[in-house]
Structures are given as C-alpha cells and as structure tokens.
Amino acid sequence: MTVLITGGTGFIGSHTAVSLVQSGYDAVILDNLCNSSAAVLPRLRQITGRNIPFYQGDIRDCQILRQIFSEHEIESVIHFAGLKAVGESVAEPTKYYGNNVYGSLVLAEEMARAGVLKIVFSSSATVYGDAEKVPYTEDMRPGDTANPYGASKAMVERMLTDIQKADPRWSVILLRYFNPIGAHESGLIGEQPNGVPNNLLPYICQVASGRLPQLSVFGGDYPTPDGTGMRDYIHVMDLAEGHIAAMKAKGGVAGVHLFNLGSGRAYSVLEIIRAFEAASGLHIPYRIQPRRAGDLACSYADPSHTKQQTGWETKRGLQQMMEDSWRWVSRNPGRYGD
C-alpha cells in the first residue's frame, strides 16, 4: 500500500514517514519546504534503508498532485501540509486560510479526481477552543477558536466531513493532536522550525544550546499546583504511530472517524523544565512573565476512545521525550544540512 504524505519533510511528517515505512507501507512525500528542509531526506534513508520518493511542490498546485497520482498507485493520503504559527495566523489570516483551507480543498478535489478516497487529516486540539472542561473528549463540540490557525483546522474538519456526507465512499480520519515533542531515538531527525519557534520545547532547547539567555514562562499564577500552565505532551513517535494505528483500524471503513492523540496527562511548564534539566544535566534559567491573552490554565486529552477503537496508546514517558529531544539538539546544533 502506497501512502502520500503531504508536508512529509516537516517535524511530524518526517517521523510518520519513518513509522509508515517501518510498518511495511510505501511512502511518497510532497512538501514545499516552507518550514522544513530537503536535507531530512537522506536522514530518512539512513533510518529506514529506503529512498522515499519526494516531490517539491505545493498542495494548491493541482498539476503536481495529478503527476503524483499518475506516477504512483496512491491508496491513501496523510495530510500534514499547512502553516501552524498561531501568532503569524493572527497577523496574516488570509495566508492561513489560503494555505490550510484552500490547499486542503484542492487536495480533496484531486484525490476525488484520482479515485483516492481515504484521508488522514492532521488536525489539532485547538479546535476545542477555550473549553475549560478537561479532559477533552471527541464528543465535545468544537469551540470558538482563538486564532485563524485553529479556525483553519476546524474549517478543514468541517469541509472533509461535508465531502464524506456527499460521497459516502470516503474514509475521513480526523486526528486532534495535543503537544508533540521529542525526536527520533537515532538523533537524526527532530523539530527544527524555520524562524521563531511556536512551542515550548524548542525554546528550552535554544536556551540549552546558548542561543537564548533564558526562557520566558508566561503566567505563574494559574490555578495549578505550581502556578504555571499545564499541557498534554506526546512523544512525536507515539504520535506518528497513532496515524498508522488509525489508518489500519479505520482507513478501509467509510465514514468520518475522529480521534484524540494525546497522553491523557498534563505537565506544567516547570515540570517540563525540570525534566529537561534532568535529561541534559544543564540548568535552564527562566523568568516568569505575565500571562498571554487566551492561554488556558490546563488542557489535556481523554485518549480512551482512541485506544478502544484503534488499540493505540502512548508508550514513551516524559523522561524519554526529554532525553530524545536533548540527543537531537546536542547532535544538531545548526540546521539540517549545516
């Protein structure tokens, strides 16, 4: 079975490519490299022993999609491609709706044209909006998303759901991620965003590597045990394996299938800092800053439905997330290819 991975050279996409190949699938990658590097490709070959076909292009380009579908017998698509910086989405909403929503529409149209009616969509827990009831369960209605990034994910979920209702042959799997961190245990691939990081751990890693003098912790007065915000963190390889489990369980079943991918436990910012210090042997200086508007005190998944339906659950704990992250950062102080 051959699977097209859009955004396959990115953080989650590259780890999912590894998991796919190691699970016996053939993979094809499409990526425009706007937030990743083609230098990941030889590293994927080193890990998997396979040359994964790669196309540099945009999901909004119907011609390159038609080329891929004509040159490969694609049976399913795992769709990661999209922009994901919350702050940038507020400043440039049209960019996000154009890439994330319109791009997904073009992809769905070309899939239908090619007779490929199985898609796994990389959604996000941001679609739950500012819901304060935790844990988050799949039967909770999407909330008022706080930014265009989250809104774009909710729109694509709705669009794919409507497409499946109109053509019941489709299998649509919607995966709502929580906070992926960690790296492949080899230290060959990991998170290396272009520009400003969007997540906590890359900032911690920049402090550890000396690129930042200290970490800013936004909010020290939340109603949590240590006053800092708490989030559900998941190892990126557990997340990658969740895609395979969902595809195996529901990829051949028509309908819309919605799953949370999280650990079911929340860790505070200070817990993450302490765990990273233990893994690296380094001190991470930090300063408590005022809360950011829209940030919640605590959010985490209820992954029980996912386990019941697919058999998937997380296997890697917080310490392994930190150890793998530190191995990645310490072995790759520059950028891919530097």
Curated annotation (Swiss-Prot):
Pathway: Carbohydrate metabolism; galactose metabolism. Its cofactor is NAD(+). Substrate binds at residues 124, 149, 179, 199-200, 216-218, 231, 292-295. One of its GO terms (cellular component) is cytosol. GO terms for molecular function: UDP-glucose 4-epimerase activity. Belongs to the NAD(P)-dependent epimerase/dehydratase family. The keyword Glycoprotein does not apply. The keyword Isomerase applies. It is an enzyme of class 5 (isomerase). One of its GO terms (biological process) is galactose metabolic process. Involved in the metabolism of galactose. Plays an essential role in the incorporation of galactose into meningococcal lipopolysaccharide surface molecules, which are important for pathogenesis. Catalyzes the conversion of UDP-galactose (UDP-Gal) to UDP-glucose (UDP-Glc) through a mechanism involving the transient reduction of NAD. Its EC number is 5.1.3.2. Homodimer. This is UDP-glucose 4-epimerase. Keywords: Carbohydrate metabolism, Galactose metabolism, Isomerase, NAD. InterPro entries: Epimerase_deHydtase, NAD(P)-bd_dom_sf, UDP_G4E.
